[in-house]
Amino acid sequence: MSRQETTPYTLGEIEQGTPCCVPKALLRVRDLAVSYGEITVLSQVSLDIYKGCITALIGPSGCGKTSFLSTLNRLTDHHERARVNGRILFDGQDLLCDPVDTLRLRRRIGMIFQRPNPFPLSIWRNLELPLKEHGVRDRQTRYRKIEQALKDVGLWDEVSDRLGISALVLSGGQQQRLCIARALVLEPEILLMDEPCSALDPISSGVVEELILRLRGRYTVVIVTHNLAQARRVANYAGFFWMTERVGKLIEFGQCQHLFETPSHELTAAYISGARG
């Protein structure tokens, strides 16, 4: 699916966080539960992820937001004690029950982690490697995709004359943008972001946030953030997670503006106001 595909609402309406019609649910989660060994960390989570929108997941540390994010492209498979139950419906397939090619899935649903994690390779190789891994053999095609991804994250003008240097010499903010470019180079349909600004200084954090805003409407983004102001600035939809009887649960989900201004649940209101959390 092309990232240029038109969304059913205008960019202006997206920026206001209020779609002009009900957007398409690209991914549906129903009754999701996650356990590690005997410990249940997440239970009874149901929500829709809407195409072309940014969905922010908020709530205190330890309430299951990152575990939830990791289920969406099956990264929980890497934890031998993880058990995931429920349904995750994507493109007519239940990702938890049907046979899934996880390599292809992670091309379609990319992940950006909390701390920048560039490979200890050149800038160019950081972006070329995933393309080769996913079967892009033509060098000109790889160059075009790499150039576009670096332009998308605002790095091209900064690094185009030194693509052969180690990615590890870049600043923290540049490294995080490179990691985002590494995901975008595969043209995913959904981009998962686990606190992408939390390890960055305020200036770098602002640059990454501006990048996220530029992605809105072109990509479907799910972002975990503890920065409530950031969630309110960037998101169309928001979900509030909370610990109930030592298990993380989704307390409230809806349009971001509504959740922040007129929350339906007293726990949501208390957390947003700073009275709880």
UniProtKB/Swiss-Prot annotation:
It is a peripheral membrane protein. SUPFAM superfamilies: P-loop containing nucleoside triphosphate hydrolases (SSF52540). ATP binds at residues 59-66. InterPro entries: AAA+_ATPase (IPR003593), ABC_transporter-like_ATP-bd (IPR003439), ABC_transporter-like_CS (IPR017871), P-loop_NTPase (IPR027417), PstB-like (IPR005670). Residues 27-272 form the ABC transporter domain. It is an enzyme of class 7 (translocase). Its EC number is 7.3.2.1. It catalyses: phosphate(out) + ATP + H2O = ADP + 2 phosphate(in) + H(+). Signal peptide: none annotated. GO terms for biological process: phosphate ion transmembrane transport. GO terms for molecular function: ATP binding; ATP hydrolysis activity; ATPase-coupled phosphate ion transmembrane transporter activity. GO terms for cellular component: plasma membrane. Keywords: ATP-binding, Cell inner membrane, Cell membrane, Membrane, Nucleotide-binding, Phosphate transport, Translocase, Transport. It is found in: Cell inner membrane. The complex is composed of two ATP-binding proteins (PstB), two transmembrane proteins (PstC and PstA) and a solute-binding protein (PstS). Belongs to the ABC transporter superfamily. Phosphate importer (TC 3.A.1.7) family. Part of the ABC transporter complex PstSACB involved in phosphate import. Responsible for energy coupling to the transport system. PANTHER family: ABC TRANSPORTER I FAMILY MEMBER 17 (PTHR43423:SF1). This is Phosphate import ATP-binding protein PstB 1. It comes from Nitrosococcus oceani (strain ATCC 19707 / BCRC 17464 / JCM 30415 / NCIMB 11848 / C-107).
